[in-house]
């Protein structure tokens, strides 16, 4: 996790929600302090420790946090994830942004852990894709790692992937790879997306570093993996669901990339319970929304 980027993101998210100030919290709490607990309301895998630690302290440096869970830990209903102490206005102002983020990231980590469990193949790495929420890619990919998965390229800038439209524009896989290599240099990996055995053989001849078997059934993936030289990495992707994932066990590919890890997840249920002068904030007044 890049903490400079994290702080930049959190500042943006807090400004979106708080704007020129939290009218409710500022008018009611003033300088009063409170205690808070972030609590799991459902089972899953936790992701977002840095968000809790960095988030509230950005709003007020006097906020103290004690984390009882680390990224990748199993959460059970009712377990305390973190304890917080500090100005009530800061904790209540930051509550919704922090909860929104850790709920979503924990949902992604939970889905990733389930995908790893369903595949049950230590030789194949479960990877994410670029099908992430705009503005949240760094965080969502961090959550995939917390769940036991691996990251595919972060963007169009850190890896070359030659797809059908690129091949059509160049006339062949060989020509597309040649142009990409000349432009990017030898330090950047080139991945080629293929669907047929003929395309596979052309990608091998073109010197691809990684070959993706796109929308291929398990038997085809197994066959293509056997045809691919050991020095070339292989990846299966496209149309793979949690239900179909076990059929890819033992196919011999190095990676399986799954869009649903980030685009179709359900957020984990996590709440923040606040007490003020031995009395629940909710008993004093309604402040959550």
Swiss-Prot record:
Induction: By heat shock, salt stress, oxidative stress, glucose limitation and oxygen limitation. InterPro entries: Aldolase_TIM (IPR013785), NadC (IPR004393), NadC/ModD (IPR027277), Nicotinate_pribotase-like_C (IPR036068), Quinolinate_PRibosylTase_N_sf (IPR037128), Quinolinate_PRibosylTrfase_C (IPR002638), Quinolinate_PRibosylTrfase_N (IPR022412). The keyword Metal-binding does not apply. It comes from the Bacteria. Pathway: Cofactor biosynthesis; NAD(+) biosynthesis; nicotinate D-ribonucleotide from quinolinate: step 1/1. Belongs to the NadC/ModD family. PANTHER family: NICOTINATE-NUCLEOTIDE PYROPHOSPHORYLASE [CARBOXYLATING]. NCBIfam families: nadC. Involved in the catabolism of quinolinic acid (QA). Hexamer formed by 3 homodimers. This is Probable nicotinate-nucleotide pyrophosphorylase [carboxylating]. It comes from Bacillus subtilis (strain 168). The lineage of its organism: Bacteria, Bacillati, Bacillota, Bacilli, Bacillales.
């Amino acid at each position: 996790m890049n903490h400079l980027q994290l702080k930049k993101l959190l500042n943006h998210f807090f400004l979106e929600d708080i704007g020129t100030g939290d009218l409710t919290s500022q008018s009611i709490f003033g300088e009063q302090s409170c205690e808070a607990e972030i609590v799991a309301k459902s089972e899953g895998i936790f992701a977002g420790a840095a968000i809790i630690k960095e988030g509230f302290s950005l709003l007020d440096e006097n906020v103290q946090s004690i984390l009882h869970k680390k990224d990748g830990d199993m959460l059970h209903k009712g377990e305390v994830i973190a304890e917080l102490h500090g100005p009530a206005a800061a904790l209540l102002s930051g509550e919704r942004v922090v909860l929104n983020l850790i709920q979503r990231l924990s949902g992604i980590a939970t889905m990733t852990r389930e995908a790893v469990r369903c595949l049950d193949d230590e030789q194949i790495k479960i990877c994410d894709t670029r099908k992430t929420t705009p503005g949240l890619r760094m965080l969502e990919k961090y959550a995939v790692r917390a769940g036991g998965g691996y990251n595919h390229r972060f963007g169009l800038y850190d890896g070359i992937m030659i797809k059908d439209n690129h091949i059509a524009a160049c006339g062949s896989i060989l020509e597309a790879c040649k142009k990409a290599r000349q432009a990017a240099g030898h330090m950047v990996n080139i991945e080629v997306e293929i669907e047929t055995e003929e395309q596979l053989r052309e990608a091998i001849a073109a010197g691809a570093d990684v070959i993706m078997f796109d929308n291929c059934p398990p038997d085809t993936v197994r066959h293509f993996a056997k045809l691919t030289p050991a020095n070339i990495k292989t990846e299966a992707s496209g149309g793979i669901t949690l239900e179909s994932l076990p059929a890819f066990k033992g196919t011999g590919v190095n990676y399986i990339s799954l869009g649903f890890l980030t685009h179709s997840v359900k957020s984990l249920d996590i709440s923040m319970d606040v007490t003020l002068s031995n009395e629940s904030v909710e008993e004093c007044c309604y402040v959550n929304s």
